[in-house]
Amino acid sequence: MASRHNPKLRFGMTLREASSFQPSLAEGPPLPVVNYGLVGKQAPGLLATPSGELPKASAVVITWASAEWAALQHVFCAGRSPMPYSTRSSGTWAGWERYSAHLPSGAPSGWTFWGYYRTVEVGGERVLLFKSNTHLDWPGPTCLTALIKMIIADVNPSVILSIGTAGGAKPQDHIGTVRAVSAGTLFESGQPQSTWPEYKNGWKANDAILGSADFKQLLFPVPMTATDLQALSSEFNQHYRSHYTVGQLDPDGLNLGDPAPLIDDQTGGGASLLTTSTFVVGTTAGTYQNYTSIEMADAVIGQACAASNTAFAFVRNVSDPVQNAALPPTVQGNWGGAVYDACGFYTSYNGAVAAWAMLA
């Protein structure tokens, strides 16, 4: 049975709606070769990965969706050659093991494994990479919490990093912005924001590489052009039988990336992202601007880590910036989903590079 996880749930889409329209860039370039030597480092080393057990590691890096997994694979395992845009939806990669041991009783039918994993060496330390098949929306928060507790018990990491795409919350953030924090807040519908539970810790990333003069050369500006944006809006209007202009869908030009993507490391501080399993979209009016981004897992990870005093941080890339507050919510969600599909591969690359730099 196919996964019932819906990565577009935060856009207000059903799984069927999410699958019915998945646009892409007409001529999306490949991800570049990662020149680790520019910052005086070596490429991650590929280690033998045991099957059927999660090995000990000093750090765990978890990601969630196919395009995020492709970017993680590229940066941590295969950065010596370009990665084609067409591989962004690949469902598997050589060298990864599937983990299905100790599934909890009463788990939903069709959910048969926790995720995929492999080990690499970064900065002289063993790092466990994990592509999760266990999500907040499916099979649900209980299973997601169980996954994190199992990783903590079996791997005994010093820190767990969750990385991947997110919706923009800051009205100034262009597509491709990366914001890293060490706190997550759980959205609770119908409750005032002041009562939403927050889970935080004091882990602070090492910014020696992030702050180096040559680090920006490792980044890849999101290649969405004005022509691409016009084509995407036309395809969007055709699918949804609408007539919105680019100026209405993207009034502030946020879907055109910065020449050098912004990497904002706020780990160790008070900034928090927002976790949701329902429709939540940041807007140009500043809705949810007190948070760094909007995603679908991390506060639950923070809660599980905090219970065992395990350090954690979240490195999230803006795959879909804030939406035009003047548009109907359905249009906001649908447009955000279109941009996410077209560009999440590229935004995830920069997030993965930032996560690597924190560990290297």
Mark where each language-model region is:
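Accessory terminal and edge-of-domain segments that mediate assembly/interaction
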Residues: 1-360
